[in-house]
Amino acid sequence: MGAAGNTGSSGDSRELMSAADVGRTISRIAHQIIEKTALDGPDGPRVVLLGIPTRGVTLADRLARNIGEYSGVEVGHGALDITLYRDDLMQKPPRPLEATSIPAGGIDDALVILVDDVLYSGRSVRSALDALRDVGRPRVVQLAVLVDRGHRELPLRADYVGKNVPTSRSESVHVLLAEHDGADGVVISR
């Protein structure tokens, strides 16, 4: 299935990242996490990756696999549902609740890395921070995203960014992952 077929756009779309690009980018982010957190060192922190549904969960799973493969350290990973913490509940159609899954050991005193596919206004991340507060008390919270498209409405930034993509507000960025869309890729559409 072609990447542009899943955008829901009027056909004006172009590929930003191929499947190979997505794979390399996830691998690079995994290496950056290992290096920045000293995860594979003798006093490395306990790291937990929490994906923001839907594609953030899949990215967190892939990052956890890569980190384990590259460092020999297994990291906990799960999902953090932000639905009830969103500030746009009344403006959008109802959404089903997703499952929140926290790995054994919880998140207290851990280095938690929130994982999302696209960083845009920052509102999803703010919702995730609110949800996280109800789950536990991490020592440090960081953010990893596959694509940062700018246009922040809140003073947030990602610690790990796969690709910075300057966009206009009229454009949409769609991350496609094989587990959901049949193939990996990133497309931009008007």
Curated annotation (Swiss-Prot):
Gene3D superfamilies: 3.40.50.2020. Pfam families: Pribosyltran. It catalyses: UMP + diphosphate = 5-phospho-alpha-D-ribose 1-diphosphate + uracil. Keywords: Glycosyltransferase, Transcription, Transcription regulation, Transferase. InterPro entries: PRibTrfase_dom (IPR000836), PRTase-like (IPR029057), PyrR (IPR023050), PyrR_bifunctional (IPR050137). CDD domains: PRTases_typeI. A motif (PRPP-binding) lies at residues 112-124. One of its GO terms (biological process) is regulation of DNA-templated transcription. Its EC number is 2.4.2.9. Signal peptide: none annotated. It comes from the Bacteria. GO terms for molecular function: uracil phosphoribosyltransferase activity. Belongs to the purine/pyrimidine phosphoribosyltransferase family. PyrR subfamily. Regulates the transcription of the pyrimidine nucleotide (pyr) operon in response to exogenous pyrimidines. Also displays a weak uracil phosphoribosyltransferase activity which is not physiologically significant. This is Bifunctional protein PyrR. It comes from Mycolicibacterium paratuberculosis (strain ATCC BAA-968 / K-10) (Mycobacterium paratuberculosis).
